[in-house]
């Protein structure tokens, strides 16, 4: 019986610890108004689960902030969009995550909404 409990405990620990916040490859839609079309590019971003809790009794002295899987370090890469008009700026700069962690959502650099547009949204259609 103790062996079964130990196995269950191990698998629960593994599910919590090993499925955490980590780098993952994603495809995003890139668009520029001057070019009037979208292309898909591959980049690296953060995804996974972070330990969080929602207290039953709220303490106004200690605000309850939910932690999300977000970037700790990032770099920017620039590409040239093919097929843009010659007079337009055809360069596009996008973020690439290099390190992730569980932290507070920074609304200055991240879409913190419950249901954002998503990485594949394109206002021009593909």
Swiss-Prot record:
Cellular component, GO, one term: cytoplasm
Key words of the record: Disulfide bond, Glycoprotein, Hormone, Secreted, Signal
A Pfam family: Cys_knot
Glycosylation site residues: 25, 42
Family matches, as SMART domains: GHB
Cellular compartment(s): Secreted
Recorded GO MF terms: follicle-stimulating hormone activity
Quaternary structure (record): Heterodimer. The active follitropin is a heterodimer composed of an alpha chain/CGA shared with other hormones and a unique beta chain/FSHB shown here.
Homology family: Belongs to the glycoprotein hormones subunit beta family.
Name under which the protein is recorded: Follitropin subunit beta
